């Protein structure tokens, strides 16, 4: 398999970082081909390897891609049914491997690869990492993730000593490897203030039962479908709902309008889930409503609409969800499917809360030390992927740099399209055409800059 240029660059940097610094993290947005990256890296490093995933279906999905990248490698599996360490690379789900009886079977390894590496400091992963290091203290660890910032605030320093590279979403869109998101902030009547005051659980996420109480009303579900039909009636769509009951009611609202919709959740059996995902990928189901099932690792390239029908207190969760719709389409795999962008409809205030889809990153060869944890990270990174330290940088975008459409009031929904790829979610307007009075209206506030007689005044207010 021939790697894309940015993949080749990242793999080369990762190999060099493993040799120089030891345990290494790489950050790439959803859709960058992280499985290809980790497979190519593992193939070049060689030795006895373990590739760790957090879901069973990802184990088989990643093993298949590994064979495509490394056709001569022997691949083994370790799960509930198969326990095979004979291959050059063994794929395992962490929940299976972290049990004491399974940990004792781990052989001496040369390389441990962790997919979705932001999970690496969780207790189940730490048990596997400790067992691997006990067998071979010199075993190298490589992790790849789209979202290094964990919701619980835990840094990754205990596992990784450096970040070899970080790809930006904007750069992959510019190169044509991801499609551009068209993002719409959709406010259902009477929900904005209630969503803004939701209680958070011990994990730091919003209470989804409270979110359900706000969003799961028949009139709201009908409004969601009505707005979806205006923007994405012909698009394959993934909907993220707050609870299973909410998902079922949302799917019913779609079906009431003649749209083939289905629900997948943690309660769906593995057999039924596989069948539903296959039907969705093949086009038999147009809208798939899910509850925390398709957030990570799921890949259906024709998806061109994502509906956030729930709030996200963690930016990483929002990024994973939106990333489901940003992949480009392989014409050989999906003949006749044309995809140029992805419509993102946010009914849960996530875009209002988090403002953008990434930290601003410049791709540079030079590294700098993080003053907080000492990790070596790319110079352009403004937030350390290892510990979360935030570097001081320039402020928000200057007036005139950002565009958005004027709000469109539709029945009981206020819908506003915003350019979420830019640093600021609002547009500056020249009130009198003289450049002396500039006014901007954002999601929740307004700002004005006035100039006269060589002096400048700034005014801010809350909407």
What spans do the regions from the language model cover?
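Conserved strand-helix element at the start of the C-terminal RecA-like helicase core
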Residues: 48-59, 210-257
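C-terminal helicase lobe
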Residues: 282, 316, 326-428, 433-435, ...
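Conserved helicase ATPase core of P-loop NTP-dependent helicases/translocases
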Residues: 60, 75-85, 248-252, 259-295
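Conserved pre-motif I regulatory segment
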Residues: 1-27
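Conserved RecA-like P-loop NTPase helicase motor core
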Residues: 95-98, 266-361
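Conserved interdomain linker/interface between the two RecA-like ATPase lobes of SF2 helicase motors
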Residues: 163-238
């Amino acid at each position: 398999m021939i790697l894309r240029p940015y993949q080749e660059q990242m793999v080369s940097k990762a190999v060099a970082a493993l040799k120089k610094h030891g345990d290494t993290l790489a950050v790439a947005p959803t859709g960058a081909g992280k499985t290809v990256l980790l497979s190519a890296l593992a193939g070049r490093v060689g030795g006895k390897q373990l590739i760790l995933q957090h879901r069973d279906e990802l184990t088989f999905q990643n093993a298949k891609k590994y064979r495509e990248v490394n056709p001569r490698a022997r691949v083994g599996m370790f799960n509930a049914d198969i326990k095979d360490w004979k291959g050059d690379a063994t794929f395992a789900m962490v929940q299976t491997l972290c049990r004491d009886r399974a940990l004792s079977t781990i052989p001496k390894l040369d390389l441990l690869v962790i997919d979705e590496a932001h999970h690496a400091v969780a207790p189940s992963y730490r048990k596997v990492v400790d067992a691997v290091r006990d067998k071979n203290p010199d075993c190298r660890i490589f992790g790849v993730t789209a979202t290094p910032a964990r919701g619980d605030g835990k840094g990754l320093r205990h596992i990784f000593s450096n970040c070899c590279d970080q790809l930006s979403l904007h750069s992959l869109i510019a190169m044509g490897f991801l499609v551009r998101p068209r993002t719409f902030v959709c406010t259902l009547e009477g929900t904005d203030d209630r969503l803004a005051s939701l209680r958070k659980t011990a994990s730091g996420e919003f209470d989804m039962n409270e979110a359900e109480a706000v969003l799961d009303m028949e009139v709201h579900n009908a409004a969601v479908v009505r707005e979806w039909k205006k923007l994405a009636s012909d698009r394959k769509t993934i909907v993220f709902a707050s609870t299973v009951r909410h998902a079922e009611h949302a799917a019913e609202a779609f079906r009431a309008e003649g749209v083939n919709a289905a629900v997948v959740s943690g309660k769906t059996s593995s057999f039924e889930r596989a069948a539903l995902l296959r039907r969705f990928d093949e086009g038999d189901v147009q809208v798939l409503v899910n509850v925390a099932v398709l957030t990570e690792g799921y890949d259906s390239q024709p998806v061109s609409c994502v509906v956030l029908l729930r709030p996200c207190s963690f930016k990483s969760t929002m990024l994973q969800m939106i990333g489901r719709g940003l992949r480009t389409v392989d014409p050989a795999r999906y003949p006749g499917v044309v995809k140029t962008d992805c419509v993102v409809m946010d009914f849960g205030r996530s875009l209002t809360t988090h403002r953008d889809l990434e930290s601003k990153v410049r791709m540079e060869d030079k590294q700098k030390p993080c003053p907080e944890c000492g990790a070596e990270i790319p110079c352009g990174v403004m937030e350390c992927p290892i510990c979360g330290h935030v570097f001081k940088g320039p402020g928000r975008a200057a007036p005139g740099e950002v565009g958005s459409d004027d709000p469109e009031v539709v029945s009981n929904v206020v819908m506003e399209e915003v350019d979420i790829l830019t640093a600021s979610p609002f547009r500056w307007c020249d009130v009198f055409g003289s450049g002396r009075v500039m006014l901007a209206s954002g999601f929740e506030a307004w700002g004005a800059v006035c100039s006269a007689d060589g002096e400048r005044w700034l005014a801010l207010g809350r909407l």
